[in-house]
C-alpha cells in the first residue's frame, strides 16, 4: 500500500513564485495594477493571439464570452456533453438554450460528423454558436469546425481550460496553438490549481477581434469605461461611463504576478506531463481490460488528464482510493445531471458521452 497519498492533482509552487507574489503584495497595487496587463501580454504572446483578458476564473471568462457574442434568451448553442458544467452553464446564464452534440469515442471531442448532421436537420439560423472543449488537453481541430461553423453562420467559443500549450496541425502543415484566435472567436483558459498554470483561481480569455476584446474588457469591469475613444461624452480625465450591465470579473495583481511566474515554466510543465503520460502508457499497455487514450500524430496533447476506460470503474476507483491513489472520474455526463435532465435531456441521449 502506498503510504504517501497521491492526489488527483496539485499545484507546483516555487520560491520564485512566492517571491513574485510577495513583491506584488508590497507594491502600490493589489488589483487593477500593472501586473494584470503584463500577464495578459505574456499570455497572448505564449498562445499567439492578439488580445488576452485576465479574469477571476474561467467560468467568468466563459460567461463574458457568451455575453460578448450576444447570447440572448432562447438562442440555441451547441455544446459537448462531456465537460465541466461551466462550458454549458455560460449559455444558460444568458438565457440561451443548450443543445448537446455527442463526442467521438476515441478522442472524447465533439464529433464533427454528428455536428454536421445536427446542423443539417434544421434551417440555417436555428443555432447561434458552438462551444468546443479541448477535452483532457486534446486539441480540437478548429480549422475543420471553423469551416462548418462558417457554412451555418455560427461563432465558436473554445473552452481551452485543459489545453494551454496544446496544438493541432492544420491542412497546411502548420501548428495551430489552442487559443491563438485563428479559428475560434474567443478561447478561454483556467488557472485553477490542478491546471497547467495556477493562480489559485483565475482565467484568461483570448481573441483576435478588437471588437470582441473591447466588449470583454467592458463587461469584465461593471460595463464601465474611461477610454476616451469609447465614451459617448467626454467631460475630462475624471469622467467614466457605465455603458452596459457588466460584472466584476477582475483578477488581482498578486494572482497575475503568480501567473507570470508560472507561465515562464509552462513548457517545462508540459514536458513533464508528456513524460508522465509515457510512463502510464508503458505501465498500463499490457493490462487486459484497460483502454488507453488515443492520440493522433496531428496533435500535441497538453495532458491535463490521462483518461483510461475499464470494465469495473467503481471497483477500480474504490481500490485506488483505499490505496491512497486519488484518481477521479471525468465527467458525470452533463446532460444527465439533474439540472439538465429537467430541461428535457434523458438516458440514451449522447451515448458517446457516457464513459
What do the PLM-derived regions correspond to, one by one?
Residues 89-91, 148, 254:
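Hydrophobic/aromatic ligand-binding patch that stacks against planar heteroaromatic rings
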Residues 29-76, 90-94, 100-102, 171:
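Phosphate-binding glycine-rich loop
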Residues 106-199, 204-212:
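Active-site phosphate-binding strand-loop segment of PLP-dependent enzymes
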Residues 97-107, 328:
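Short beta-strand->loop structural element characteristic of the AMP-binding/adenylate-forming
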Residues 37-41, 49-52, 113, 129-133, ...:
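PLP-dependent aminotransferase class I/II
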Residues 1-29, 34, 241-243:
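N-terminal "arm"/small-domain region of PLP-dependent enzymes with the aminotransferase-like
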Residues 73, 79, 100, 156-158, ...:
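Hydrophobic residues in well-ordered beta-strands that form the structural core
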Residues 83-88:
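Conserved coil-to-alpha-helix start sites within the AMP-binding
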Amino acid at each position: 500500500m502506498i503510504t504517501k497519498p497521491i492526489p488527483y492533482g496539485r499545484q507546483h509552487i516555487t520560491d520564485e513564485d512566492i517571491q513574485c507574489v510577495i513583491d506584488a503584495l508590497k507594491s502600490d497595487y493589489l488589483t487593477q495594477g500593472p501586473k494584470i496587463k503584463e500577464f495578459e501580454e505574456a499570455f497572448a504572446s505564449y498562445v499567439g493571439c492578439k488580445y488576452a483578458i485576465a479574469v477571476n476564473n474561467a467560468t467568468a471568462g466563459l460567461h463574458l464570452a457568451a455575453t460578448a457574442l450576444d447570447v440572448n434568451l432562447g438562442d440555441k448553442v451547441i455544446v459537448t456533453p462531456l465537460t465541466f458544467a461551466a462550458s454549458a452553464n455560460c449559455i444558460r446564464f444568458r438565457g440561451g438554450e443548450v443543445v448537446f452534440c455527442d463526442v467521438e469515442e476515441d478522442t472524447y471531442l465533439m464529433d464533427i460528423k454528428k455536428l454536421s448532421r445536427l446542423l443539417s436537420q434544421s434551417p440555417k439560423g436555428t443555432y447561434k454558436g458552438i462551444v468546443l472543449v479541448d477535452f483532457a488537453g486534446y486539441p480540437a481541430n478548429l480549422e475543420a469546425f471553423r469551416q462548418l461553423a462558417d457554412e451555418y453562420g455560427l461563432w465558436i467559443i473554445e473552452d481551452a481550460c485543459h489545453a494551454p500549450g496544446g496544438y493541432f496541425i492544420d491542412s497546411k502543415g502548420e501548428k495551430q496553438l489552442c487559443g491563438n484566435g485563428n479559428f475560434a472567436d474567443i478561447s478561454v483558459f483556467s488557472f485553477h490549481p490542478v491546471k497547467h498554470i495556477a493562480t489559485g483561481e483565475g482565467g484568461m480569455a483570448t481573441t483576435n477581434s478588437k471588437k470582441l476584446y473591447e466588449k470583454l474588457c467592458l463587461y469584465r469591469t461593471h460595463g464601465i469605461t474611461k477610454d476616451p475613444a469609447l465614451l459617448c461624452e467626454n467631460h475630462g480625465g475624471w469622467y467614466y461611463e457605465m455603458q452596459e450591465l457588466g460584472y466584476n470579473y477582475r483578477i488581482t495583481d498578486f494572482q497575475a504576478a503568480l501567473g507570470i511566474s508560472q507561465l515562464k515554466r509552462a513548457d517545462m510543465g508540459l514536458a513533464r506531463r508528456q513524460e508522465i503520460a509515457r510512463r502510464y502508457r508503458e505501465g498500463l499497455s499490457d493490462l487486459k481490460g484497460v483502454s488507453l487514450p488515443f492520440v493522433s500524430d496531428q496533435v500535441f496533447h497538453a495532458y491535463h488528464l490521462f483518461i483510461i476506460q475499464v470494465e469495473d470503474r467503481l471497483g477500480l476507483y474504490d481500490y485506488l482510493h483505499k490505496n491512497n491513489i486519488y484518481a477521479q472520474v471525468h465527467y458525470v455526463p452533463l446532460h444527465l445531471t439533474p439540472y439538465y435532465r429537467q430541461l428535457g435531456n434523458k438516458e440514451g441521449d449522447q451515448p458517446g458521452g457516457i464513459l
